[in-house]
A protein has these predicted regions:
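Acidic, metal-associated active-site segment
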Residues: 63-64
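Basic, Lys/Arg-enriched alpha-helical interface segments
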Residues: 1-58, 67-74, 78-86
Length: 86
């Protein structure tokens, strides 16, 4: 987890988001390396072309980097589209 991700999770907690939903998505990624289609996971492009994004609920997003050959995940952001992309 990055420092930014930790700050993002604190902001989401203050907003009253159900953090169990985020934890569930993270656990699924850790266990399976992917998410079900209901999360709408997809690869990003441009400045974020090494990252993936999914929808936790509505406009609440999770962004992460994934290296399948090394079996690593790096959670880099969570929040709304405007929080994360300006």
């Amino acid at each position: 987890m990055t420092k930014t991700f930790r700050k993002d999770t604190e902001r989401c907690q203050k907003r009253g988001y159900n953090m169990e939903l985020l934890k569930t998505a993270i656990r699924l990624l850790e266990a399976q390396g992917s998410l079900p289609p209901s999360y709408r996971p997809h690869k990003l492009s441009g400045n974020y072309d090494s990252s993936w994004e999914c929808h936790i609920k509505g406009d609440w997003l999770l962004i992460w980097e994934q290296n399948d050959s090394e079996l690593t995940l790096l959670f880099t952001g969570t929040g709304t589209h405007s929080d994360l992309f300006g």
